[in-house]
């Protein structure tokens, strides 16, 4: 079964820690802490994410411990 974009869940969070390979520890609004990597569009356009930035994270309902950073506020 192919997952559509409608199946993804979006949360707003704050970057707590910068990890290697464009990976971040993000604290979501609901106080959960997840690991998130940078989306390809952000990597391609060289958008920098720094400690304390507010970000929009996209997650799959199947694994709520990992996500993808899709927007920086």
UniProtKB/Swiss-Prot annotation:
* Cellular component annotations (GO), alphabetically ordered: cytosol
| SUPFAM superfamilies to which the protein is assigned, alphabetical | Nucleic acid-binding proteins
Q: Name one GO molecular function term.
A: rRNA binding
CDD domains for this protein: S1_IF1
Kindly give the NCBIfam families that the UniProt entry links to this protein: infA (TIGR00008)
Reported function: One of the essential components for the initiation of protein synthesis. Stabilizes the binding of IF-2 and IF-3 on the 30S subunit to which N-formylmethionyl-tRNA(fMet) subsequently binds. Helps modulate mRNA selection, yielding the 30S pre-initiation complex (PIC). Upon addition of the 50S ribosomal subunit IF-1, IF-2 and IF-3 are released leaving the mature 70S translation initiation complex.
- Protein's recorded name: Translation initiation factor IF-1
Q: Which species is the source of this protein?
A: Rickettsia massiliae (strain Mtu5)
Q: Which gene encodes it?
A: infA
């Amino acid at each position: 079964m192919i997952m559509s974009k409608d199946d993804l869940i979006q949360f707003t969070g704050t970057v707590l820690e910068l990890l290697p390979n464009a990976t971040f520890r993000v604290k979501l609004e609901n106080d959960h802490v997840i690991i998130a990597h940078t989306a390809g569009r952000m990597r391609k356009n060289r958008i920098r994410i720094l400690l304390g930035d507010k970000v929009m994270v996209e997650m799959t309902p199947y694994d709520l411990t990992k996500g993808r950073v899709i927007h920086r506020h």
